Regions:
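Flexible, acidic/Gly-rich N-terminal and inter-domain linker regions that tether
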Residues: 1-72, 377, 385, 393-450
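Conserved, mostly hydrophobic/aromatic
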Residues: 64, 77, 116, 173, ...
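Short, charged beta->alpha transition segments
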Residues: 65-67, 96-107, 214-215
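Canonical Radical SAM [4Fe-4S] cluster-binding loop centered on the CxxxCxxC motif
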Residues: 67-96
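Conserved AdoMet/S-adenosylmethionine-binding subsite of the radical SAM
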Residues: 99, 122-305
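Short Fe-S-cluster ligation motifs
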Residues: 103-119, 291
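Long, highly charged, low-complexity intrinsically disordered interaction regions
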Residues: 272-344, 380-429
């Protein structure tokens, strides 16, 4: 098929400015799980692809070129900056232009790979063909062997999605909003079924490919890094309980690698969108990520963390601490005898430290100094554990007492950023940071009051 996308008169740098800026609200990009090495013939490898592919507030260079194929779109989603009715500068890359940019940035060590999304130009199938053509050129003509993550466009022809899957490391289909009702109200052109269909196709393709790789060692990989999705949080009235249940269902039914949560930012000014006087709900986004981690790695279920009577996460305590203080009948846990499943539910004990505890206690009984060396955060764990039947200090196993002590340090909103999780570092601006961000400013940013 001929790809009738003209370069036009717009300079490439202007296109890059427009289309990197337009891509900054899509957070569903990561390269974890891909370990393809260089083959000596191609350019790039994915050995170092587990690093954080995001943008920092201190001016550090991003390692993933995150751009849109085009910000033209036939849809008119109320929350989207690139909606059809929005008056913004428009631009479209050709596949060759994206390949050129990717290779030039890679050779200069600016990036580790490519994250390519797109508005819908013409129709979904044509847009997916452009994405597929771009990646095919990168892999075959330019011999690029680095990490590539692209979008699967809902409504695109299944055979084009299939072809794309054999060329990329990860694919994602954005769920957009947690429920079908929210999607109908803010994105009337989109339908839940058309979003879930490519998710199911990718899941099936990965499973079939996994079996093929058992039989044929050199079989080509299909979406080797798995698939992910993204939900916008705060644009519609769903509770945290609804959102985390949707995420759990996606993990169970579609074998997703990641669900990303994006705090809603009103970039269109549409009057039907909620007003956010305190700014984007960044603390809520943070709590959802913490709960998501508990679902994926700690053996928790959504119904254990929240229910219809308690539909929102605690502002002051992280989800694991909140669960623990509500289930004090299960504590204290004896470190030297508790199974791994119980250790993982103790605040201050992570996956790695729980594994180290299980391994270390085979050689003898563990003490509190041993736990500190292992990596346990004792200032949180001490209320919930004993070593050889003794607690670290004589503390009360009472909910009010523990909550008071856990929330004493107000700077425990653990972002590690200034709250601007939705902002992308410009590839061109010379940003000057006149002073470091203070602890108070971090707290204000976390709760949307900065």
């Amino acid at each position: 098929m001929e790809y009738l996308v003209s370069k036009g008169e717009m300079p490439l740098e202007d296109k890059l400015n427009i289309l990197t800026d337009a891509a900054k609200y899509d957070v569903a990009c990561t390269s974890s799980g891909v370990d393809r090495k260089g083959d000596g013939k191609s350019i790039g490898n994915c050995v170092a692809a587990g690093i954080c592919h995001s943008f920092s507030g201190d001016g550090r260079c991003i390692s993933l070129l995150k751009i849109l194929m085009t910000n033209e779109c036939i849809f008119d989603c109320k929350y989207c900056r690139n909606r059809r009715s929005n008056d913004v500068p428009r631009a479209t890359f050709t596949p060759e232009e994206i390949c050129t940019l990717t290779m030039e940035f890679y050779r200069r060590n600016y990036i580790e790979g490519l994250f390519l999304s797109s508005g819908i130009i013409g129709n979904p199938t044509f847009t997916q063909e452009l994405i597929c053509r771009t990646v095919w050129l990168l892999r075959n003509r330019y011999r690029f062997n680095g990490y590539v993550h692209v979008k699967a466009i809902p409504g695109a022809a299944p055979e084009i999605i299939q072809q794309t899957g054999f060329l990329v490391d990860r694919m994602s289909v954005n769920l957009e909003l947690p429920t079908a009702e929210g999607l109908r109200s803010l994105a009337p052109n989109k339908h839940r079924k058309s979003i879930l269909t490519p998710m199911r196709q990718i899941q099936t393709g990965i499973q079939v490919n996994r079996n093929d790789l058992v039989l044929y060692r050199n079989a080509p990989k299909f979406v080797g890094g798995g698939q992910s999705t993204q939900m916008i949080i705060g644009a519609t009235p769903e509770s945290d309980y609804q959102i985390i249940n949707v995420a759990e269902s996606l993990y169970q039914k579609f074998d997703l690698k990641r669900v990303f949560y994006s705090a809603f930012v009103n970039v269109t000014g549409d009057k039907s969108l909620p007003a956010l006087p305190g700014g984007p709900p960044l603390l809520r986004e943070h709590r959802l990520y913490q709960a998501d981690w508990l679902l994926r790695f700690y053996g928790f279920r959504a119904e254990e963390l929240l229910d219809e009577k308690r539909p929102y996460f605690n502002v002051m305590l992280d989800p694991k601490e909140d669960w623990a203080v509500r289930h004090l009948e299960r504590f204290p846990v004896e470190i030297n005898r508790a199974p791994l499943e119980e250790l993982l539910r103790v605040p201050g004990i992570g996956v790695k430290s729980a594994g180290r505890i299980v391994a270390a206690r085979r050689s003898g009984s563990l003490t509190f100094p041993d736990l500190k060396k292992i990596g346990v955060v004792l200032k949180r764990a001490l209320y919930f554990i004993t070593c050889s039947g003794r607690m670290m200090y004589p503390v009360k196993i009472e909910e009010d007492y523990i909550v008071r002590n856990l929330t004493t340090e107000k700077d425990r909103v653990r972002f590690g950023s200034d709250g601007m999780s939705y902002k992308q570092l410009s590839l061109f601006d010379d940003v000057e940071f006149t002073r470091p961000v203070t602890v108070i400013e971090r707290q204000q940013a976390a709760v949307g009051q900065l």
